[in-house]
């Protein structure tokens, strides 16, 4: 194990410290990469509407960095006074805003350029192309300094509305009117959420009333970097929870404190990531939040303290939350947690977490002793008892002493990350991971993440029967987007052309201009070719002079998965039936449901329906499940409220709308007669209201009865 020392630093205590070429580690043979036979192609190329996107800077705040760059020398205090994310935090939301069956793309922007809504024209044009309709749809938000966003059907109208977050200002709630237009109901709804640095948001029905509430991750005043650099939480802002009070144009009330979510004792954390997910699969939507360690030494190094955690707020099913982070074992994993994705990565039937982090290629920070593995982007695995196992167990001095997986699934080291998505990009039936990101701050920008695509090696390659193994696939690095130079924040996944392959959309706050320098760190990782852009060079203790490197406005990439291995897939969209069927509880999007898919002969995949995760972004709510060479599979949905439904004989290539049937096949209290009556009555109502076809209702009825009979067999 290697601990790199202070003499190896170009920079100093910061969000970003890059290493000079003289600082190196012993050469190791890098881990092998894999070619899964899948290709990606970036279609946001010159001449397209997508290529016109440019992320706008934050205005006067950005000018501080510009002015510093013109000076002969600057000091650490000058860096501290610079804004955080001075080029903003562009978020990506993939959603079908007009219900035409094709996924559209929303990308936030800054005060000098409008946000974009890229309408997918495939249904009318017959080919994949996009047009920016933000202005006519009412989503341009001119002059608004936007960060992340999330979307959901807040009034159960059948259309997804969108919530866009403000930087050091209030948020905007845009109600989808169902006619291609959004109405700004921010003030009338009470959803402004005050003047905070709102970063990420997520929607979920926390109180179990069939309405989507909104949880917001807040950071600190982004006009300067004091929250990171001054080693104090005094600058941090508490997170928020807005409860949906109902109505066609819903009103919201702040229940942040009364719900138990916005814990401020002793002080709030600096939160980057948030997600509403039924983590324990009990029918109740919990909240997972990621906070940042910042420039504070970890406890194991004898000072400072641990403050950056994956925090879990467990829901009592009525909207009251308890912070169970310690009880589930996550206080042993401090870090700079920045983005979340969820899946059954190790095939044990539990929902586990992948968290992006500072990575292994930017350490150590000046004066902060660090070991390989402390800040790895990595998976945190849920055990059968509801606690979590960290393969790196960073409270131990060395990962190997935890008895876990010191090789981190064979990758050894992982790069920096912001946005992340769990997806089965090669449709082999195993959940993979894609993430991206770069930190631009202080004396440079890191370029260690070329576009990370981690292929899950499957159930036969588990380590110690529990820890998954992953291989790096360079397919994203080779798609033409040049993600290594793009300072990516927003990442979202969805099938944009309905071809059965999950695509990726990434938004960058900036693009690096100038020579990238190799930092010569070698861990035996496929990411050992890490680089950085020097914007300043050290000329003494706490003194720096400008270097040639700089950044320019960020871009958008739409990275289309072209397949290539012949594997099959199926797609599913959940349809909650509250207000449509007596006894139904699930919101119209089915947000909070957990969908399981078991292809014939393969393990079960789990994909929770999450309206806002990653970093400042949101995946499509339409889920794509890989099937390998299987031709059939079984879908199972655990709905908010705890009802379970099944559909057998799902065929390869099918696109299923799965409605909530408010009668659980696992309910031991129901007779066959009562259960049959409930199923048929519910499906008849859904057919009558045009939500499912008669033929699909017959399939769901047959499957429901089969599932009930199987679950009630003696023994």
Language-model features, listed with the residues they occupy:
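Acidic/hydrophobic-patterned starts of short beta strands in beta-sheet-rich repeat architectures
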Residues: 99-109, 156-165, 208-217, 281-290, ...
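Gly/Ser/Thr/Pro-enriched helix-cap/hinge segments flanking short amphipathic alpha-helices
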Residues: 388, 465, 469-482, 501-515, ...
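Beta-propeller blade termini
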Residues: 89-99, 119-120, 145-156, 175, ...
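Soluble extracellular-acting proteins and domains
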Residues: 661-715
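C-terminal motif of bacterial Sec signal peptides marking the signal peptidase cleavage site
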Residues: 21-22
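Bacterial N-terminal signal peptides that target proteins for export
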Residues: 2-12
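Blade-edge motifs of beta-propeller repeat domains
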Residues: 28-86, 119-144, 175-196, 228-269, ...
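Short, conserved, GDST-rich strand-edge loop motifs in beta-rich repeat architectures
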Residues: 217-236, 290-307, 356-374, 436-448, ...
């Amino acid at each position: 194990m290697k601990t790199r020392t202070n003499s190896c630093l170009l920079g100093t205590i910061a969000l970003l410290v890059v290493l000079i070429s003289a600082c190196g580690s012993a050469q190791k043979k890098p881990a092998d990469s894999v070619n899964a036979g899948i290709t990606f192609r970036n279609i946001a190329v010159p001449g397209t509407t997508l290529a016109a996107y440019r992320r706008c800077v934050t205005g006067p705040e950005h000018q501080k960095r510009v002015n510093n760059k013109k000076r002969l020398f600057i000091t650490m205090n000058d860096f501290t006074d610079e804004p955080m994310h001075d080029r903003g935090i562009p978020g990506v939301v993939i959603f079908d805003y007009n219900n035409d069956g094709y996924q559209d793309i929303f990308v936030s922007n800054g005060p000098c350029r409008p946000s974009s809504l890229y309408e997918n024209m495939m249904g009318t044009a017959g080919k994949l192309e996009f047009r920016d309709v933000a202005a006519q749809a009412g989503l341009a938000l001119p002059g608004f300094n936007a960060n992340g966003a999330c979307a959901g059907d807040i009034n159960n109208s059948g259309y997804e509305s969108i919530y866009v977050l403000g930087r050091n200002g209030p948020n905007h709630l845009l109600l989808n009117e169902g006619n291609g237009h959004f109405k700004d109901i921010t003030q009338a709804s009470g959803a402004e959420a005050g003047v905070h640095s709102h970063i990420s948001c997520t929607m979920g029905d926390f109180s179990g009333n069939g309405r989507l509430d909104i949880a917001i991750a807040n950071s600190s005043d982004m006009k300067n970097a004091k929250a990171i650099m001054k080693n104090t939480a005094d600058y941090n802002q508490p997170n928020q929870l807005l409860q949906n009070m109902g109505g066609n144009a819903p009103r919201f009330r702040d229940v942040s404190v009364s719900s138990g979510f916005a814990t401020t004792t002793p002080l709030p954390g600096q939160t980057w990531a948030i997600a509403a997910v039924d983590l324990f699969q009990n029918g109740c939507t919990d909240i997972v939040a990621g906070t940042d360690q910042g420039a504070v030494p970890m406890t194991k190094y004898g000072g400072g303290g641990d403050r950056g955690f994956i925090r879990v707020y467990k829901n009592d099913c009525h909207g009251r939350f308890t912070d169970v982070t310690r009880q589930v074992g996550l206080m042993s994993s401090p870090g700079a947690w920045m983005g979340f994705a969820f899946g059954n990565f190790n095939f044990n039937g539990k929902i586990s977490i992948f968290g992006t982090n500072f990575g292994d290629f930017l350490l150590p920070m000046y004066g902060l002793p660090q070991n390989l593995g402390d800040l790895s982007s990595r998976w945190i695995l849920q055990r059968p008892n509801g606690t979590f196992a960290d393969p790196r167990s960073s409270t131990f001095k060395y990962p190997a002493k935890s008895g876990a997986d010191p090789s981190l699934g064979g990758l050894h080291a992982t790069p920096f990350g912001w946005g992340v998505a769990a997806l089965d990009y090669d449709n082999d039936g195993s959940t993979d991971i894609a993430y991206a990101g770069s930190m631009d701050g202080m004396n440079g920008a890191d370029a260690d993440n070329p576009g990370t695509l981690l292929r899950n090696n499957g159930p036969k390659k588990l380590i110690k029967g529990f820890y998954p193994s992953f291989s790096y696939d360079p397919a994203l690095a080779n798609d033409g987007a040049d993600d290594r130079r793009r300072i990516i924040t927003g990442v979202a996944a969805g099938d944009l052309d309905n071809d059965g392959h999950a695509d990726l959309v990434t938004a960058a706050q900036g693009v690096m201009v100038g020579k990238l320098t190799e930092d010569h760190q070698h861990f035996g990782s496929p990411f050992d070719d890490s680089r950085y852009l020097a914007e300043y060079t050290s000329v003494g203790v706490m003194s720096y002079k400008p270097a040639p490197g700089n950044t320019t406005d960020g871009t958008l990439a739409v990275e289309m998965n072209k397949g290539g291995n012949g594997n099959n897939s199926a797609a599913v969209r959940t349809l909650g039936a509250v207000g449509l069927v007596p006894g139904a509880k699930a919101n119209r999007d089915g947000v909070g449901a957990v969908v399981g898919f078991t292809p014939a002969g393969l393990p079960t995949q789990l994909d929770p329906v999450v309206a806002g995760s990653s970093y400042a972004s949101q995946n499509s709510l339409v889920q794509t499940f890989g099937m390998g060479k299987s031709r059939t599979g079984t879908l199972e949905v655990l709905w908010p409220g705890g009802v379970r439904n099944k559909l057998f004989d799902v065929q390869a290539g099918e696109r299923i709308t799965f409605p909530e049937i408010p009668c659980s096949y696992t309910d031991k209290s129901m007779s066959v007669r009562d259960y049959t009556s409930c199923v048929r009555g519910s499906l008849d109502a859904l057919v009558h209201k045009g939500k499912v076809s008669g033929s699909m209702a017959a399939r769901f009825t047959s499957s429901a009865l089969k599932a009930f009979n199987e679950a009630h067999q003696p023994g």
